[in-house]
Amino acid sequence: MAAVQMDPELAKRLFFEGATVVILNMPKGTEFGIDYNSWEVGPKFRGVKMIPPGIHFLHYSSVDKANPKEVGPRMGFFLSLHQRGLTVLRWSTLREEVDLSPAPESEVEAMRANLQELDQFLGPYPYATLKKWISLTNFISEATVEKLQPENRQICAFSDVLPVLSMKHTKDRVGQNLPRCGIECKSYQEGLARLPEMKPRAGTEIRFSELPTQMFPEGATPAEITKHSMDLSYALETVLNKQFPSSPQDVLGELQFAFVCFLLGNVYEAFEHWKRLLNLLCRSEAAMMKHHTLYINLISILYHQLGEIPADFFVDIVSQDNFLTSTLQVFFSSACSIAVDATLRKKAEKFQAHLTKKFRWDFAAEPEDCAPVVVELPEGIEMG
């Protein structure tokens, strides 16, 4: 880890007040990082010191000893660190990952008594990126992490999956109407159909809130279905009441958690959840009137998140549609209206101007959502 220039008095205070994470036996050459910083581990590396208290994301990629250029998928985990706290972890050679099992208290205390001698093997937390990290995680609480992280706490760029059915024998394939192994595929689609259905290994999946696929209540009339398909407030309130009953603001913590898992953990499923959750928030006009503080904070979150991703990242390769501009276009048409809270309206107008100037995105055109909406009615309901 490269040396960081820091005022001696500040360094002394941080050494005694900051948290320390010790990671024993991490192999030389491993790509290791904390929050917005990453390094290649050297032979003397034992961890990170002077870490500010709060939520942090530690991530790493193992390296093939025979071919150091071969880097494994990124893995990571969240830690909630406290003032003067000491966390002791170990590298598992067998699993090639950090073992998150808590170290015995006696070992932790022995390590604490030896911190002065261990200091030379600990890299200092890079404070230059602390403000950026806080801006991306200020709504992620310890409770958010406990709720969303996988049961095994390891967040992996590639899902650990298993087949839904083992199908070890030919009779198992016949039972699923699948052709015998060895029979040549006649088309690409047939080849896809032969692939086994997969599911995440138990305990490895990020536990995101389930988002509704039906945006209207049971028994809704055709007019109500159309209304709830244009304004998703009913669906959003369903999520807030079920998942965040005591504090609707906590949905913003989940939005940030998903973004960090994608940005730093390289988890594509987290990006897809971020898009779906953002779409639900941005297309809920009635909810903006009720939860204006939540939406004021949402704008601040998006301001910092969008600064981390290239402008063309959200453009669909096939259709060339930009998910973000179309979603925010609907958001601004509601948030900039006279009916909403004045503070929210002013902040939305400033944010819109900022995005237009920075990314040259056009929010002036009428959004497609203003066109007539075609909705599929539930079975048994007919238009009057």
From Swiss-Prot:
Residues where N-acetylalanine is found: A2
Gene Ontology CC entries for this record: spliceosomal complex; U5 snRNP
Q: Which InterPro entries match?
A: AAR2 (IPR007946), AAR2_C (IPR033648), AAR2_C_sf (IPR038514), Aar2_N (IPR033647), AAR2_N_sf (IPR038516)
Superkingdom, natural source = Eukaryota
Q: Where are the transmembrane segments?
A: none
- Key words of the record: Acetylation, mRNA processing, mRNA splicing, Spliceosome
Pfam families per UniProt: AAR2, AAR2_1st
Q: What does UniProt give as the signal peptide span?
A: none
GO annotation terms (biological process): spliceosomal tri-snRNP complex assembly
UniProt function note: Component of the U5 snRNP complex that is required for spliceosome assembly and for pre-mRNA splicing.
Q: Which family does it belong to?
A: Belongs to the AAR2 family.
How this chain assembles, per its entry, is: Interacts with PRPF8 (via RNase H homology domain). Component of a U5 snRNP complex that contains PRPF8.
Protein name per Swiss-Prot or TrEMBL: Protein AAR2 homolog
